[in-house]
Amino acid sequence: MLLAIKDFFNSLLLKELFKGMALTGRYLFARKITVQFPEEKTPMSPRFRGLHALRRYPNGEERCIACKLCEAVCPALAISIESDVRNDGTRRTTRYDIDLTKCIFCGFCEEACPVDAIVETHILEYHGEKRGDLYFTKDMLLAVGDRYEPQIAAAKAADAKYR
């Protein structure tokens, strides 16, 4: 009976309402953490996984040896590779495709690659107007790698002590 009377007076005096308003008032004047994204950028982790790229050796030869480990380890089945044996007995890729609509950006392909051929860059701003625009071919991936090689090499060097 005493508890019922206490609850009645608490609800009559709107105690719960004022507790909620006090909580709201505390956060009303606090520092805002919202970032206006296109204009403002937040700091990016050095291990951020963005757009994929295929790398080349300094002599211009592509690094991928067509071992297909990245294709095998991809949980989303986003990578498809076809290879061919060259005259000197080494294998090279003839087709290397990544479907970014399937990719979950887990980084397993990058970890599995024995020659650091496939990497995930820090590029996060890319788009496609059609589904096919997010289907990256070998030439497109090599172009991304060629364009951003200095940044990729710097990120690899900075991360080398943790590998």
Curated annotation (Swiss-Prot):
<keyword id="KW-1278">Translocase</keyword>
<keyword id="KW-0411">Iron-sulfur</keyword>
<keyword id="KW-0677">Repeat</keyword>
<keyword id="KW-0997">Cell inner membrane</keyword>
<keyword id="KW-0874">Quinone</keyword>
<dbReference type="InterPro" id="IPR017900">
    <property type="entry name" value="4Fe4S_Fe_S_CS"/>
</dbReference>
<feature type="domain" description="4Fe-4S ferredoxin-type 2">
    <location>
        <begin position="94"/>
        <end position="123"/>
    </location>
</feature>
<feature type="binding site">
    <location>
        <position position="113"/>
    </location>
    <ligand>
        <name>[4Fe-4S] cluster 1</name>
    </ligand>
</feature>
<keyword id="KW-0472">Membrane</keyword>
<feature type="binding site">
    <location>
        <position position="106"/>
    </location>
    <ligand>
        <name>[4Fe-4S] cluster 2</name>
    </ligand>
</feature>
<feature type="binding site">
    <location>
        <position position="74"/>
    </location>
    <ligand>
        <name>[4Fe-4S] cluster 2</name>
    </ligand>
</feature>
<keyword id="KW-1003">Cell membrane</keyword>
<feature type="binding site">
    <location>
        <position position="109"/>
    </location>
    <ligand>
        <name>[4Fe-4S] cluster 2</name>
    </ligand>
</feature>
<keyword id="KW-0004">4Fe-4S</keyword>
<comment type="subunit">
    <text>NDH-1 is composed of 14 different subunits. Subunits NuoA, H, J, K, L, M, N constitute the membrane sector of the complex.</text>
</comment>
<dbReference type="Pfam" id="PF12838">
    <property type="entry name" value="Fer4_7"/>
</dbReference>
<dbReference type="GO" id="GO:0048038">
    <property type="term" value="F:quinone binding"/>
</dbReference>
<dbReference type="GO" id="GO:0051539">
    <property type="term" value="F:4 iron, 4 sulfur cluster binding"/>
</dbReference>
<feature type="binding site">
    <location>
        <position position="64"/>
    </location>
    <ligand>
        <name>[4Fe-4S] cluster 1</name>
    </ligand>
</feature>
<comment type="similarity">
    <text>Belongs to the complex I 23 kDa subunit family.</text>
</comment>
<dbReference type="GO" id="GO:0050136">
    <property type="term" value="F:NADH:ubiquinone reductase (non-electrogenic) activity"/>
</dbReference>
<comment type="function">
    <text>NDH-1 shuttles electrons from NADH, via FMN and iron-sulfur (Fe-S) centers, to quinones in the respiratory chain. The immediate electron acceptor for the enzyme in this species is believed to be ubiquinone. Couples the redox reaction to proton translocation (for every two electrons transferred, four hydrogen ions are translocated across the cytoplasmic membrane), and thus conserves the redox energy in a proton gradient.</text>
</comment>
<feature type="binding site">
    <location>
        <position position="70"/>
    </location>
    <ligand>
        <name>[4Fe-4S] cluster 1</name>
    </ligand>
</feature>
<dbReference type="InterPro" id="IPR010226">
    <property type="entry name" value="NADH_quinone_OxRdtase_chainI"/>
</dbReference>
<dbReference type="GO" id="GO:0005886">
    <property type="term" value="C:plasma membrane"/>
</dbReference>
<keyword id="KW-0520">NAD</keyword>
<feature type="domain" description="4Fe-4S ferredoxin-type 1">
    <location>
        <begin position="54"/>
        <end position="84"/>
    </location>
</feature>
<protein>
    <recommendedName>
        <fullName>NADH-quinone oxidoreductase subunit I</fullName>
        <ecNumber>7.1.1.-</ecNumber>
    </recommendedName>
</protein>
<feature type="binding site">
    <location>
        <position position="67"/>
    </location>
    <ligand>
        <name>[4Fe-4S] cluster 1</name>
    </ligand>
</feature>
<feature type="binding site">
    <location>
        <position position="103"/>
    </location>
    <ligand>
        <name>[4Fe-4S] cluster 2</name>
    </ligand>
</feature>
<dbReference type="GO" id="GO:0005506">
    <property type="term" value="F:iron ion binding"/>
</dbReference>
<keyword id="KW-0408">Iron</keyword>
<keyword id="KW-0830">Ubiquinone</keyword>
<dbReference type="GO" id="GO:0009060">
    <property type="term" value="P:aerobic respiration"/>
</dbReference>
<keyword id="KW-0479">Metal-binding</keyword>
<dbReference type="InterPro" id="IPR017896">
    <property type="entry name" value="4Fe4S_Fe-S-bd"/>
</dbReference>
